[in-house]
Amino acid sequence: ILGERYSQCDKMNRTGIAIVARDKGVRHGITLRNLSIHHVEGNVYDKHMNNGGIYATALRPTSEETNDVPRFQDMTIEGCFVYQVSRWGIAVGYTYAHAEFQGAELAEASFRKYGHENLVIRDNYVKAAGGDGITAMYALRPLIEHNMADSVAGEINDRIYAEPGGKMGKVAAGIWPWKCKDALFRYNEVADTRLNQDGMAYDADSGDGTIYEYNYSRQNEGGCVMFCLQEAIHNTFRNNVSYDDLGGIISPSENPDALLQDNIFYVRKGVPFVRKNMDGGAFTEVNNQIIGIEE
């Protein structure tokens, strides 16, 4: 658009592939496979609408009285390369019915009526996303596996995120869920996430029963993992390896009950295990190894 500044607040949202459910109820069997999506200059401030590489949304139907609830079932995104996009790398999927997912304990019935089911995100490579790498939202038992998020959150800084106009959201992380139930993240890798108020590889955020297992992280400027606030419950982080993550390895962030078990943390001298100003939560450690990195 002529005269549009890269960082302006009302910049047009742009998406490599936008998937939108609205007036036809449940959308079944959508598969995106082996796609290359790159150089999408979206709006770095907009976290909730189609904006970035691949983004799926369920929007309010034209008539809620006559249309079924729009949502997704049996969606798979696999084998895609998403490079230099803003804001998101891959996200599935924001819903207009977000008010149905309030509180910490999330009822399975809410997902079967308003949320997404049988979501699989696997074997994707997201590099240099301006904001977050890969996120599952409002999904029941999503599977996120064998993905790579490399050098994401590169625009969540004062230089580019400079004209928010009162919008919140100057935070981003690597691979994480939002308001999911029993999400499973395994065999993923996150490297070189740029520092911001978050900036960690993994973030169990406002969900119920998130499991991270057999994942790897290295040199993420905001640390390895965050358990985000009081509405993220029943989180388990097990059998993962963190190598030279920075800033502070874990961020319990007022979380009530995180479990860290059978992980290996390779830690540089001077890097705290708990990130400063991201503490205050309760967590249990079982059989973890903390190994110093030789200079």
Annotated model-derived regions:
Residues 226-230, 247-255, 274-280:
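Short, contiguous acidic/charged loop-to-helix segments that flank catalytic cores in large enzymes
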Residues 16-17, 52-55, 91-92, 98, ...:
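Carbohydrate-interacting regions of secretory-pathway proteins
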Residues 28-41, 65-88, 100-132, 140-165, ...:
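Right-handed parallel beta-helix
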Residues 9, 24, 46, 69, ...:
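Residue-level marker of regulatory loop/turn positions in helix-turn-helix DNA-binding domains and
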Residues 3-31, 43-70:
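Extracellular beta-strand-rich solenoid/capping regions of secreted or surface-exposed proteins
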Residues 19, 37, 56, 92, ...:
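Extracellular beta-strand solenoids
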Residues 48-54, 170-172, 199:
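Glycine-centered small-residue motifs that form tight turns
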